[in-house]
Amino acid sequence: MALWRTNDSKVYLPPAPVSRIVNTEEYITRTGIYYYAGSSRLITLGHPYFPIPKTSTRAAIPKVSAFQYRVFRVQLPDPNKFGLPDPNLYNPDTDRLVWGCVGVEVGRGQPLGVGLSGHPLFNKYDDTENSRIANGNAQQDVRDNTSVDNKQTQLCIIGCAPPIGEHWGIGTTCKNTPVPPGDCPPLELVSSVIQDGDMIDTGFGAMDFAALQATKSDVPLDISQSVCKYPDYLKMSADTYGNSMFFHLRREQIFARHYYNKLVGVGEDIPNDYYIKGSGNGRDPIESYIYSATPSGSMITSDSQIFNKPYWLHRAQGHNNGICWNNQLFITCVDTTRSTNLTISTATAAVSPTFTPSNFKQYIRHGEEYELQFIFQLCKITLTTEVMAYLHTMDPTILEQWNFGLTLPPSASLEDAYRFVRNAATSCQKDTPPQAKPDPLAKYKFWDVDLKERFSLDLDQFALGRKFLLQVGVQRKPRPGLKRPASSASSSSSSSAKRKRVKK
């Protein structure tokens, strides 16, 4: 039985329609032309803990650590200015060509090894795992020389836009509630571009250690005055156009080796309801409860390597399926499994029969070796009105590089033309040279890799190209050998001779 009742619920209207983000496969036509491109051997060398400033007798030494990001900005040639094997491949009036990345291999040299990091004045007080008795709050400096093997990380991010990282930094305070000296400042999660040379999370957290740790001894030397960033996978995965991360490879491993508490005073006391007070013997007042662990990356094996392997991109995690806008590609790498630091000793005096430490000096260096290889597919875009409007909304510089813009009408005004230009009596008539377009990423630091002259159609001449041909099932045509082929007459006579032997 149907009963009528008054409407006691709210009326919800549908949300306003928004423009739809389309996948690149909906407006891009892929051709059957593939190119191989590879870099040379990329080597960097420096001090693993801090940069050495320049002096009058020595050049500056950069900081090169296995716990830094390596962000390669790969420059690609403009396919619209390329000498193509098929001139009828596209119509320059209505089409444009772009590169699509379908294969990548990041090569790593140098042996596997563990590089230690540490601090000669590390802020550790008690061993809180095997503590025998509480010692009370110490007032003297008991910092000690401590080294750790940091968290093990292997990472590779592929995209056509710079990667995004996150870390904890000092937040802004309200004007009516200032922070007194000695109080904990407010924190905020900061998102920023990951640049080449930025420090990774080594197991002590992703934060601005230079701004948030005044003791300068709570973490190892290589990060005590740095900002450790962690890739913002959530933000890059939610990228509207999917340019920051086509896909990524990641392997992290860590466990806690030692457990300590900190030496300095505690800013926030434990509430009395949380414990029963001690009766002396070093238990009143109680010790610091600011605990910290030293990380360890554990064992390193070749079975767990993500580098020196080819990877094929069939479907990206975002809307950009490997299209390299602005003819550039960003490769972000981290590999702590090859973190061995080279120790070098030199003699300051003649070597004596007995060992004298003052006669020698010790130095430490770290080197890295990379190689980048790619397989690119030539793709075509038909520039309809909808596609051009979509690309302009995504990135206006794409159409500017394709020479699309407003055409100014011819000038109808009368212009001046001097006869004698190069003399002191006439005003200078030299035109101001046009300024180059500013690079929107010039303020960031990347490792530039120029591949504009390293493209090749002969895929079977390169290791990654042969792997790609095997992957897609294309067989190479055998080349004619040096042996001269047999003539038809000799082959017919030999076959007839064989038939005669059979008749006998």
From Swiss-Prot:
Q: Which domain of life is it from?
A: Viruses
- Composition-biased stretches, type Low complexity, lie in 486-496
Q: Which UniProt keywords apply?
A: Capsid protein, Disulfide bond, Host nucleus, Host-virus interaction, Late protein, T=7 icosahedral capsid protein, Viral attachment to host cell, Viral penetration into host cytoplasm, Virion, Virus endocytosis by host, Virus entry into host cell
| Residue span of region Disordered | 476-504
Coarsely, its chief localization is virion
Coiled coil residues, start to end = none
Which Pfam family, giving just one, matches this sequence? Late_protein_L1
Give the similarity note. Answer: Belongs to the papillomaviridae L1 protein family.
Q: What is the protein name stated in its UniProt record? A: Major capsid protein L1
According to its UniProt entry, this protein's organism is Human papillomavirus 51
